[in-house]
């Protein structure tokens, strides 16, 4: 074959490879109901088809096209050069501390929005005590409490469509039932009669073996990600604030130091459900995952008890610990701009739970997904947030000794009450939330290894997918009456 023939073959093969890659991108984008990406991908696909025809039938165009494709490949090659500066997440959640930790202040559970909304009730001693200490919260809390519980009037954005609201309500019944079984002592439940309760009855397992069993058991039960960490006492709440079962004597008590190890799990929220945000299918998916997490962690906790060890399940009806820093320490992900976990494989599209235990286990190492640098330039969650609760600034601020982008919990929680769902728009619009499929796997692979990609990819993502959020069509079995658009619920009205 002549040199010109070899040149023609190489040029054609390179362009064909690009065409196939773009074709896969278009296919995945259509499958994901993306409104903009298939159009952009289709235009690029057509452009390279034209290039292919020019390569075959116009010899004079081959050299300029070769230069063009060479430049394209060279730019792509730059993203494959492994170079990162090392994210703070590699030091675990402690990497986000602003200083040496001397100015760190533990989170008080009494201050979280859920506790202020449903566990500080007018006319109670807790009400008088809390607002004597925090009078700055009183006016907002009373206005928000008048709107209802955490979700206000559930499902109001979708005309309170009863089948969907009933799915949400029924999902939360399981955590309600399991909350009382969260704390487990050795020999608890049915294991008591078989193994007894004495210290000598602890099962003697090598930590490596125990770790393998625990991780496999958790995944068999339904966890999508599992990690283990030493439990850092800084990530425990300082005082009890959430009361679910009438034990009001516990309100305001100091939360004891946690057990030495934590098994942290994440469950994936189905992409198609999340992408309907802020409509009811997204909160149905949240409720389902909270039920799933309660189920998994309760079984794990009682497994530890049956093995002769103490354990505490951390789920929607019993939290001693903050889940996000725990998950970072356990190697499940990083802290994102929206204030919660960007998980491996699934991005923010997860719910996180844990089990404390004193069984010796082997901790995992924190990971670097490239999310922190990516979030600096991306800002999609902040720009799409209906209540403007996520900061747009590139730089982080220090809060309780932690350097991070600080979510405005009050405006966020107000929006929940307005639409009757937990919103999920920031979760849905995040580029890391895209399904764990071929194209997105490749992007994640590059982001983990390339500092340049972390800076440039947010702009490429905006070009391909657009910057603003639009809810996707819900699955047919979750169709709700039309007439209420998410746009009608944007803004922070009612806060003034």
Question: What function would you assign to each model-found segment?
Answer:
Residues 224-447:
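Catalytic cores of enzyme domains
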Residues 11, 15, 20-23, 35, ...:
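Flanking helices and flexible, charged tails adjoining ferredoxin-like Fe-S electron-transfer domains
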Residues 2-272, 279-280:
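Non-catalytic, usually N-terminal nucleic-acid engagement modules in DNA/RNA processing proteins
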Residues 7, 25, 45-47, 57, ...:
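Phenylalanine-focused residue identity feature
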Residues 54, 94-97, 154-157, 243, ...:
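Compositionally biased, intrinsically disordered low-complexity regions
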Residues 39, 106, 132, 138, ...:
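Context-gated lysine
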Residues 28, 32-34, 109, 142, ...:
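Glutamate identity and glutamate-enriched acidic tracts
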């Amino acid at each position: 074959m002549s040199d010109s023939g070899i040149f023609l073959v190489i040029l054609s093969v390179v362009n064909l490879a690009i065409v196939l890659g773009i074709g896969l991108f278009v296919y995945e984008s259509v499958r994901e109901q993306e409104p903009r990406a298939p159009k952009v991908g289709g235009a690029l696909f057509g452009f390279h088809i034209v290039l292919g025809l020019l390569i075959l039938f116009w010899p004079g165009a081959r050299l300029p096209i070769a230069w063009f494709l060479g430049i394209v490949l060279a730019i792509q090659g730059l993203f494959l050069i492994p170079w990162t500066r090392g994210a703070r997440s590699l030091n675990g959640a402690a990497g986000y501390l602003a200083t040496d930790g001397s100015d760190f202040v533990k989170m008080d559970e009494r201050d979280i929005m859920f506790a202020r909304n449903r566990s500080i009730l007018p006319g109670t001693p807790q009400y008088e005590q809390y607002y004597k200490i925090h009078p700055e919260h009183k006016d907002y809390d009373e206005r928000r409490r008048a709107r209802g519980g955490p979700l206000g009037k559930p499902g109001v954005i979708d005309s309170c469509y009863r089948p969907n609201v009933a799915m949400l309500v029924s999902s939360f019944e399981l955590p309600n039932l399991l909350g009382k079984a969260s704390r487990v002592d050795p020999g608890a439940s049915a294991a008591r009669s078989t193994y007894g309760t004495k210290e000598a009855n602890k099962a003697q397992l090598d930590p490596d073996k125990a770790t393998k069993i625990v991780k496999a058991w958790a995944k068999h039960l339904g966890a999508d990600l599992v990690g283990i960490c030493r439990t850092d006492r800084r990530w425990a709440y300082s005082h009890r604030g959430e009361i679910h079962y009438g034990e009001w004597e516990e309100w305001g008590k100091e939360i004891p130091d946690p057990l030495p190890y934590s098994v942290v799990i994440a469950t994936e929220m189905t992409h198609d459900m999340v992408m309907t945000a802020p409509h009811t299918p997204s909160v149905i998916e949240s409720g389902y995952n909270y039920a799933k997490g309660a189920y998994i962690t309760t079984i794990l906790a009682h497994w530890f008890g049956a093995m002769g060890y103490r354990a505490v399940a951390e789920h929607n009806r019993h939290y001693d610990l903050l889940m996000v820093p725990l998950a970072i320490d356990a190697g499940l992900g990083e802290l994102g701009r929206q204030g919660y976990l960007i998980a491996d494989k699934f991005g923010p599209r997860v719910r996180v739970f844990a089990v404390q235990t004193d069984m010796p286990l082997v901790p995992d190492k924190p990971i670097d997904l490239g999310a922190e640098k990516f979030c600096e330039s991306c800002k999609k969650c902040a720009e799409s947030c209906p209540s403007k609760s996520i900061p747009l600034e590139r730089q982080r601020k220090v809060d309780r000794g932690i350097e991070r982008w600080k979510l405005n919990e009050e405006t966020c929680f107000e929006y929940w009450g307005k639409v009757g769902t937990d919103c999920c728009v920031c979760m849905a619009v995040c580029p890391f939330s895209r399904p764990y499929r071929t194209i997105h796997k490749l992007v994640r692979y590059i982001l983990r290894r390339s500092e340049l990609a972390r800076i440039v990819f947010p702009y490429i993502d905006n070009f391909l997918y657009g910057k603003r959020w639009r809810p996707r069509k819900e699955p047919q079995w979750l169709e709700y009456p039309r007439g209420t658009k998410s746009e009608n619920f944007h803004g922070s009205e009612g806060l003034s």
